[in-house]
Every structure is written in C-alpha cells, then in structure tokens.
C-alpha cells in the first residue's frame, strides 16, 4: 500500500482523490520522493493516517502535509447498459453537457477517460436520473481499481 503526503484537510480515511502529478510549487521540495510516488490519473482512497508523524512544510497545502496510506479505488460510472455485467469491460458513453443532471458525476467521473476500456467490478443498478437527456440507456457500475 503506497504512502504519500496530503494536506490535513484531505487526510481522512475514506477521502478519495485523483492524482494529477506534481504542481509547479513541488519543484525543489525535499519530500518529492515520498509525495509524488502515485500514478497520474488514478483515483485513490485514503485508508489510514499515519499517527505520530509530524506536519511537514508544504508549498501546495497551506496547512502543511501529513503521511497517509492510500490505495487505488473503484470509480463509480455509468456505461451503456448493453453488455454491462460484472467482469466485462466497459467504456463511458461519451461527454455530456447536462451538468445539472444527477447522473453527470457518473457520466464524466473523476479518474476515468472516455477513450479507455475499464473492467467492471460491480453493477450498482439504475443511475440516479429519471430520464437521460441524450436518450442513452445507462447502467451504474463500479470500474475496478487501476493496476499499479
């Protein structure tokens, strides 16, 4: 399980984030090796906060940074219903301009891209919307965690 550094506001078990790589302010930081050891574009979940560790100075996080355990996590997403079952591969249906839709966060989920096929780990059922404005027949699924 990878150990990385996060700001205290994010350092809670269950918090999920997508690692986007180093910020410009990371240049020259003495903690780069411990902090920038994740895979870009992967969604992670904080599983534990290291107790007794000190808060390190950090140019990115205004309250400093603390050591946490993280692991790649599933990505809740909507996929076309046809052929969607646990164990199969699935892709996102495509971009959606309807940001007010209750399913939008699943149609364009953080940590997933439109041009990638993902392993479906689990079927969650019907998406939260009553009707898709793009007339898509969608199923809510969990994409398997990314391989490290």
Curated annotation (Swiss-Prot):
Source organism superkingdom: Archaea
Protein family: Belongs to the UPF0179 family.
Annotated protein name in UniProt: UPF0179 protein VNG_1401C
């Amino acid at each position: 399980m990878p150990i990385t550094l996060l700001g205290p506001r994010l350092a809670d078990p269950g918090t999920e984030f997508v690692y986007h790589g180093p910020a410009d302010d990371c240049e020259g930081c003495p903690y780069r090796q411990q902090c920038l050891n994740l895979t870009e574009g992967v969604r992670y979940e904080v599983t534990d906060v290291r107790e007794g560790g000190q808060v390190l100075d950090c140019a990115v996080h205004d309250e400093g940074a603390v050591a946490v355990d993280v692991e790649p996590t599933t990505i809740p997403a909507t996929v076309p219903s046809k052929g969607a079952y646990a164990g199969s591969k699935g892709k996102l249906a495509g971009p959606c301009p309807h940001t007010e839709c209750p399913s939008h966060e699943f149609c364009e989920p953080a940590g997933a891209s439109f041009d990638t096929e993902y392993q479906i780990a689990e079927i969650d059922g019907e998406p939260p919307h009553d009707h898709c404005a793009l007339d898509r027949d969608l199923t809510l699924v969990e994409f398997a965690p990314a391989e490290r």
